[in-house]
Amino acid sequence: MDCFHYPLDTETLLRKKRRLRRELLAQNPHPLHKKIAILGGSTTNEVADQLGLFLLQYGIEAEFYQSEYAQYWQDAMFGTPELDEFHPDIIYVHTNWRNLTALPTTADSETDIDAMLDDQYAHFETMWQALEAKFGCPVIQNNFDRPNFRLMGNRDIWDPHGRSNFISRLNQKFYAYAAAHEHFYINDIDYLSADYGLTAWGDAFFWHMYKYAMCLDAIPSLAASVAAIIKSLYGRNKKALVLDLDNTLWGGIVGDDGVDGLAIGPEVPEGQVYAEFQSYCKALKSIGVILAVDSKNDEANALAGLNHPDGVLRPDDFVAIKANWEPKDRNLTDIAAELNLGADSFVFADDNPAERAIVAAQVPGVAVPALDGAENYIKMLDHGGYFEVTALSKEDLKKTELYHQNAERAKAQASFSDYGQYLDSLEMTATVKDFEPLYIQRIAQLTNKSNQFNLTTLRCSEDDIRAMAENPAWLCRCGKLVDKFGDNGIVTVTAGEQAGDTLHLRLWLMSCRVLKRGMEDAMMDTMVADAAARGVKTICGYYYPTAKNAMVREFYASFGFEKVEEAADGATTWQLDVAAYQPKHPHMKIER
């Protein structure tokens, strides 16, 4: 639906929201259900409506609790029966500068202003701590937008008596708290208001007439921003950017104009635009976005263009380069298959509207922003919110390297006729560990990012993972895989809750980067042996179907589990007699 893509079609979003909701629910019959509490310092009904729409397009169906008008602090500090019974998965504190109870004046001393700043910050910090203690779920907090007037003009931003200066300093305190607390996230309305236009955003009519924190037409932009954070937390980010070449990464057509005729680099304004876009793409790579090329070109010409002396991107920045005369939708499908990623993990960037339309029609799930003018490419991708970062792991920072290693493995496989011999040639070592503190962040990240090889799709915060690790009733294991081509890092997670002599597997997932390598065999062998050592006689496994995890529907059957129950929605329960388990003995060394 184009109304959700930048630039947002606010008229459709606001006026046809009921129809949009029906259509989105029809498109995704198995959404992820989440409870979101909105604690507002202003009217929040439209915020909830728009946030619900944006989350639905990410496959998340939200149920909302909304505080009464301006009761955000009271609900957080003193609670309500309704909020307590709601048990939110996420709390969004929707406040703005009008919720500050004190602002400096020229009559205040700098000491008084500092004390005022501390008091205003303490008002919020105390609330965040109370929410963490009671609910232990992620909290999203607006920072503060600026008032749409400056009492002292330009001096307002640097003079301690200025409201703009005070709000800027208070925002910095919010950011310091966010940096120190892993489940706390800032929704940057300071940026959103500037991007939208502060005068329009802060139109006082909407505050005094309706008690909206911003103008009505800005609420979809606010909702898109909050939804981007939430979908990132639940693993709904895009993972890959697939790029055309001619008139996308450089100006001109390399096959016609030659490398010397391309517009790229500092010599001409057009070349500067493309160089800046290449720099942006390279920066995306640095935060874990994988890059690929899908271009109608001869491969030699494509590589020559990517080696242009004034270019920023080089061939080894890409995990796949499809430069040929095949249809681009077919190339993209091939890239997805090679990387073991679903099509909905991709963003396709191409200057040609005809190519964009074909890919959008033929490859459901891929995001296809309407690139219009090279000077707008960065803006279109950035405002799309495709790659919102809520956490960065070491694996994210070396994602391209990991995929290059997989390409080397694929080349090695081609030289073997026997798959077992190929696996032996990889010289693999699996290290199976408890949920140790060093791995907590990565484990939590995997639970929220893994969709295909994920039997229960249980999404966990770092605190959830710690709680499992510290509970003696839980048997928790994570697996790391190393071979002669490199270190894949933590790639698989299992967790089971023991009740008597039965172990219930609540969590079982694996990164698709290591499919068909035997890592699941190593984990099952280890898990069963460890369970037996704890006196477990029966292991129960659970499969909950989603739109993406059909590949593991019969996973437990392959290990000798017996299906004992199947629900109408396809959910299944399996049981294993531990004494009868036959170890798989995968083609790898297993270390503990």
Regions picked out by a protein language model, each given a short descriptive name:
Residues E61-F64, D317-A320, G365-G373:
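Short hydrophobic/aromatic-enriched beta-strand-loop microsegments
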Residues Q272, E276-N307, L455-C460, D464-I465, ...:
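Substrate-recognition element of Asp-dependent hydrolases with the DxDx(T/V) motif
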Residues L332-P353, V359:
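Conserved Lys-Pro-Asp/Glu-containing loop-to-beta segment of HAD-superfamily phosphomonoesterases
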Residues E338, A360, P364-L426, A529-R592:
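Terminal substrate-recognition subdomain of acyl/acetyltransferases
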Residues T431-S511:
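A conserved beta-strand-loop-helix scaffold within acyl/acetyltransferase catalytic domains
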